[in-house]
């Protein structure tokens, strides 16, 4: 008896027509049955936002005539896409959800703001093994071909071994040729941050407005971080948990005089 192929849900935050998701779809088609539910427009930096005070549209679309799998374009956020896919579109629970390939880094603190990773986290919340993939190239002409080998390797391992409940993977791939990438490293998230700046301007009507700018600052010198791995030419893999409890502080917090 033929073993049923794994069902793989593909989404992203750059939009359903973005080059990154097209590469991801092609790789996933080699590993299972694919269905795509992705935003109809770019949703970068949306984090785990969901649509609760507006209508949500989701319709089947044809991106390529040669595709035999189904694709759906959704007016909502990446997290919305996963929710509506699992609750309204799919007839069975996916074996895996993959999100990406993002244009740009989602390493370190960027994971908090990332729509790419929030889609993966939403899948994890729903008990679906999930991976977020990002390429450290913000160019509209980014070359995603070097990512294929590493995405396939990591995905095959997740399909084979599964992931613990409450854990998803954050994968970042350096902007290098495939032959220049040294391998894959399991890492921790670097303790870095953004130093934000606001560019204050005035529009023709005299109304002030702001553009958010800033720079990424990493003072974490640890050799086991995602930032260090990427700097050295490795693909970084960070196991991410969405239980935000600071377990190490519970005992100390319990000693406070909170009921006095």
From Swiss-Prot:
Gene name of this polypeptide: surE
Function summary: Nucleotidase that shows phosphatase activity on nucleoside 5'-monophosphates.
Reactions that this protein is recorded to catalyse: a ribonucleoside 5'-phosphate + H2O = a ribonucleoside + phosphate
Main location: cytoplasm
Keywords: Cytoplasm, Hydrolase, Metal-binding, Nucleotide-binding
Localization per record: Cytoplasm
This protein's name: 5'-nucleotidase SurE
Family: Belongs to the SurE nucleotidase family.
EC number: 3.1.3.5
Co-factor requirement: a divalent metal cation
InterPro entries attached to this UniProt entry: SurE, SurE-like_Pase/nucleotidase, SurE-like_sf
CC cofactor note: Binds 1 divalent metal cation per subunit.
Residues the record lists as binding a divalent metal cation: 13-14, 44, 102
This protein's GO CC annotations: cytoplasm
SUPFAM superfamilies named in the record: SurE-like
Recorded GO MF terms: 5'-nucleotidase activity; metal ion binding; nucleotide binding
